[in-house]
Amino acid sequence: IIHQDPVLSTTKLIAEPWDLGEGGYQVGNFPLLWSEWNGKYRDTIRDFWRGEHYTIGDFAFRFTGSSDLYQDDGRLPHASINFITAHDGFTLNDLVSYNEKHNEANGEGNRDGESYNRSWNCGIEGETKDSEILSLRAKQRRNYLTTLMLSQGVPMMLGGDEIGRSTQGNNNTYCQDNELSWFNWQLSKTQQALLTFTQKLIKFRQDHPIFSRHQWFFGREIHGSGVVDIGWFHPDGSEINDTEWHDSSNQAISIFLNGAEIPNLDNRGQRILDDSFVLLFNPSDEPLDFTIPESVEKTE
């Protein structure tokens, strides 16, 4: 068994936990020491940002490391390899630019590749010069990247997403050893802006350990700050109660992360302290006012 091997057990073991056939989808079923590409994270976050009536309970699980998949068997948040896109499927740019795959160039009659991509073209299929559509697509790319980098677990990016790489709607470019798959490092202003945004986002995550806790959230105070380690709220500032987690009409959410209640210790055995954050998520196409909850207003 791989994870019992004296050499391999000391390495990072990461599974792509699906295969063809019955029983091939094994997300959440690998043993201790293994991390997994979390396909449920990908699907939930894609649906959330394209406005599907997904329950906020599903979003909450994925955003906090998928404890429903990994906690019961003793694994920790880093067991979840979070991703929006990978080598199979749309690039991030194409995820917000195409509703349908366009794999005709592969010579298989567009039958190859995944047909259900949970994508949204923002109003026009494929390339466009419409400034409103382009602006919305840029915002959606930022939404996906920000959610990925602020989620508990290990973020994984598809190379090229940081510069808006496109394969023109082809989501299965295994046979395209040409300009369709190659990287073009001559960046446009839009691509350079996305690269800069992504670099700053990664630096922000690295600077704030609250976004990469080594333990699960408890939903209560740990170190006596008087405030819970995580809180979930409606836009009006009221706390989400147990009966509302599975109400698909509740889409927008604010999340409080308490930087004074991190259970991790640093390399010297000292408590880790960070800033506290209130994160606002609004997947609708309308602006929305949020109220900072009274219970967290006095935290730093």
Which functions belong to the PLM regions below?
Residues 130-133, 184-190:
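Short histidine-centered catalytic/ligand-binding loop motif
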Residues 183, 201-209, 284-300:
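C-terminal accessory region downstream of the catalytic core in glycan-modifying enzymes
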Residues 167:
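Conserved nucleotide- and phosphate/pyrophosphate-binding catalytic cores
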Residues 232-293:
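Carbohydrate-binding surface patches
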Residues 3-159, 164, 172-176, 209-212, ...:
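Conserved alpha/beta catalytic core and glycan-binding cleft of carbohydrate-active enzymes
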Residues 81-82, 181, 253-255, 299:
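A broad, low-specificity signal marking well-ordered, structured residues that form hydrophobic/aromatic
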Residues 189-246:
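Catalytic cores of secreted or luminal carbohydrate-active enzymes
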Residues 174-185:
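Acyl/amide activation-and-transfer machinery of modular secondary-metabolite enzymes
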